Structure formats: structure tokens, C-alpha cells
Design a protein with these regions (language model features):
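Catalytic cores of nucleotide-sugar-dependent glycosyltransferases that transfer UDP/GDP/TDP-activated
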Residues: 1-416
Length: 416
């Protein structure tokens, strides 16, 4: 059949069978494939660039593989369900709808193309949503093909779901389709430390944060310092990184602050490796040199124009000895070999005293949920799906989480 696959086991709990699909053989057939989708579904692929073409072809190839698997490995009595996540896999759903309609197709979106565009471009999403015309927005942000695939998949699916009530509202407006079901996100609690391990892991994570802070500054920090963090993708406004930094600036100006605060921004960005002065100080803490960069663990590309660094400067967070709040930017993936921490993210998370995720656009929000799983108190907002879920299911204050009300235009209030 010309399908190129590799079959193995996914290295997660349960070790499920996984099929890796190579879609590259379909690149030369892309015009015929997209023409067929236009004729059957009016899917508008004409303006799609490679960031549309490649995922669409992957989805198509995945649909072909599912068709082949069902034909050769299932009986007529078996009920087969294929679940497609996000617009990037939607072409597979469309292929199966016509080629093998007996397969039940679920389409799950974890955000919307237009919602992410609006929020990411500093436009008011929630207060103005009903005034936005989806077709005009798609043209404005040059995402006509992505929007078309997302909308078409939602309408053609046998069951359309999303991860939160707040995203269900987006779907109804931008995709002109009510979801059939809201399926809140979650995870198997198999990667959190056991009761016996927790104390040791927390101590190791905390010690690492203190060591790195001292190595960056070239001077000691308080042993009882409050360690605070934010993490996630580098979406400056959507993830509330701007609000986090503003809050640290306000906290630093609070004369009543009695404890030193070490604030870590764990957000991957372009960088050129670990800061050598920092590494020297980690190796030889008693011969510490004063770093030329008091914020960064790694050499950040274009630091002068970086939004995080510019916001830190604007808040006059200088990391001087007099400052009660010290803020650090870790622009590296924390997978155990970043060159500075050399510990996986979760082994560091457990060492924090508090996390804060003051999100503006967050269809669900795993990060505060992960914090709770690791027994770290957390802060989120009512614009995060998880935050809304907590508000709905807990009528009283929860000891581990604070959900701050957030809406369009109130970033300064949220920071306060």
C-alpha cells in the first residue's frame, strides 16, 4: 500500500502499542489530496503554507494507516473509534469519513486557531469575541487553511469535544459548532514521587535552586528564601509571564517584605548554552566571581530585544543585594542535561515553595495541576480551564490553589 510505518511500545505507563507514521511519501501527491478534500468537504487549502501542508499530510497518512489496520486486523463485529487531536490531524478524520465511515471519529481541540491568534496578538478575546467575524480574522492572521481544517473536522466528526468550558465558548463562535462533550484534561498519577521519596526529592530540588541562584549572583542567598516559579511555553501574554514579572516588581517594592524571594522563569527560548561564569561558580563556590549577567542561566539569543528581559528591566528588578526579590530566567528545556541544573523539570518543581501561572489564554492549564500533584501550592486564573474547573467543583477555598479573577484589560489588577 506504500505506507511507511514503525511499530513499537510507547515508553509510558502501560507501554501501549504505538505506530509511527511517515507521511513524506504523500508530499508529491499533495495537490491531488487537497483537491479531493475541496471537492468533498470544501476544505480551503489553497493558501496553506508548509506549516499547514505538513501536518495536514501527516493527518491524511494517519487516516490511511488506520484504514489499513482496520481492514486487516478487525472483524465486522468490532466497533472502532479513532480520536483526532487538534487541527493538525483533522485531515485523517476527513479521509476516514469518506473511505471508512464505519470508524467512529472523535475530534478534540485543545484550543482554537483563531482564539490563539487573537490572544497572542494583544487583542481582547473574551469581551469582544461575539464581535469577531471568523472569516475576517482568518484572513487577517493568514490562517485561512488552518481555520478551515479545524472547522471542517469539527463539523464532520461523529463526536466533537474540547477540554474546558471556556474553550467550548470559543468553539461555538469561531467554529460555528457546539461541542458534544467537554472532556477535562488530566494525567495518570504515576510520575509523582511516593511518600517515601517526596521529602528527599524536595530537598534536592530546593538545594539546586539555591545553588544556581548563588552561582548567578556570585554571593550567598538566604537559606530560608521563598522559591517561586512560572513555567511553560514562551507565550509572553497568554501564559501570564508579563503579569508574573510585574507582580515580582511590585513585591520587590513592598517595604514590608520580610523574606528573600527567588523567582524563577522556566521558559525555553533560543540560547547558546550554559553561562560559563555560572558554571565556574557552581564548581568553585568559594572562589565565586561576580557574573556579568545577574539574571540568565544560559546565553540568551538577542537578550536586548527579549520580552522577558525587557520586562524585568522595566520593573527595575536589578538582583542587587538590597533587593528582596531576585528574579532568574532559565531559557532552556529542563530534561536533565541542560548544562546548569541537569535535573528534569519535575525534580525541580517539587523543590519550589509556590508556583504562579496568571494566564490570559489557557484552554486547560496542566502546570498548576502538576504543581498540586507534587504538593506545591499554586496560583492560576479564571481564564484558565483548570482554574474554572476548580471554581466550579470547590465552593470553599482550597488550601493548595488560589484562583484569581481575570478578564480583558485587568493585567495590572491581577499582578497586584
Amino acid at each position: 500500500e506504500g505506507l511507511r510505518i514503525k511499530v513499537g511500545r510507547w515508553n509510558v505507563a502501560g507501554k501501549p502499542i504505538v505506530i509511527l507514521v511517515d507521511f513524506s511519501t504523500f508530499i508529491t501527491q499533495k495537490d491531488e489530496i487537497f483537491a479531493s478534500f475541496w471537492e468533498k468537504y470544501k476544505l480551503d487549502s489553497i493558501s496553506g503554507q508548509w506549516d499547514y501542508i505538513e501536518p495536514a499530510l501527516f493527518g491524511y497518512a494517519a487516516g490511511k494507516v488506520i484504514e489499513s489496520f482496520v481492514r486487516f486486523n478487525s472483524s465486522i463485529r468490532q466497533r472502532i473509534i479513532a480520536q483526532f487531536h487538534e487541527w493538525m490531524t483533522g485531515a485523517g478524520l476527513l479521509y476516514l469519513k469518506s473511505a471508512m465511515p464505519q470508524v467512529g471519529c472523535v475530534f478534540t481541540t485543545h484550543a482554537t486557531v483563531l482564539g490563539r491568534c487573537v490572544a497572542g496578538n494583544n487583542l481582547p478575546l473574551y469581551s469582544e469575541m461575539k464581535n469577531y467575524v471568523p472569516e475576517e480574522l482568518a484572513r487577517r492572521f493568514n490562517v485561512i487553511s488552518k481555520q478551515s481544517l479545524e472547522k471542517t473536522a469539527a463539523h464532520q466528526a461523529d463526536c466533537f469535544t474540547t477540554v474546558s468550558e471556556i474553550t467550548a465558548t470559543e468553539c461555538a463562535h469561531f467554529l460555528d459548532k457546539e461541542v458534544d462533550l467537554v472532556t477535562p484534561n488530566g494525567f495518570e498519577n504515576v510520575f509523582t514521587p511516593s511518600e517515601a521519596e517526596w521529602e528527599g526529592k524536595r530537598k534536592a530540588g530546593r538545594e539546586k535552586f539555591l545553588q544556581v541562584a548563588q552561582a548567578i549572583l556570585g554571593r550567598p542567598v538566604a537559606e530560608d528564601a521563598l522559591i517561586l516559579g512560572i513555567s511553560g511555553r514562551y507565550e509572553f501574554k497568554n501564559k501570564g509571564i508579563d503579569v508574573f514579572i510585574d507582580a515580582m516588581g511590585q513585591l520587590n517594592r513592598n517595604n514590608g517584605l520580610g523574606k528573600e524571594v527567588l523567582a524563577f522563569i522556566l521558559v525555553p527560548a533560543g540560547h547558546a548554552g550554559a553561562n560559563k561564569e555560572l558554571l565556574h561558580n557552581l564548581e568553585l563556590p568559594y572562589q565565586a566571581v561576580t557574573s556579568t549577567d545577574l539574571y540568565l542561566t544560559h546565553y540568551l539569543n538577542d537578550s536586548a530585544n527579549d520580552p522577558v528581559m525587557n520586562r524585568i528591566r522595566a520593573q527595575k528588578l536589578r538582583n542587587s543585594e538590597e533587593d528582596k526579590v531576585k528574579i532568574f530566567f532559565v531559557p532552556s528545556y529542563l530534561n536533565g542535561d541542560d548544562g546548569v541544573f541537569n535535573m528534569p523539570y519535575y525534580d525541580l518543581l517539587v523543590g519550589m515553595d509556590l508556583t504562579a501561572f496568571p494566564s490570559y489564554y489557557e484552554p486547560w492549564g496542566y502546570t498548576p495541576l502538576e504543581s498540586l500533584a507534587f504538593k506545591v501550592p499554586t496560583i492560576t486564573t479564571t481564564l484558565a480551564g483548570f482554574g474554572l474547573w476548580v471554581k466550579e467543583h470547590y465552593n470553599m477555598n482550597h488550601p493548595g490553589i488560589e484562583v484569581i479573577h481575570r478578564e480583558d484589560g485587568d493585567a495590572s489588577n491581577v499582578a497586584t
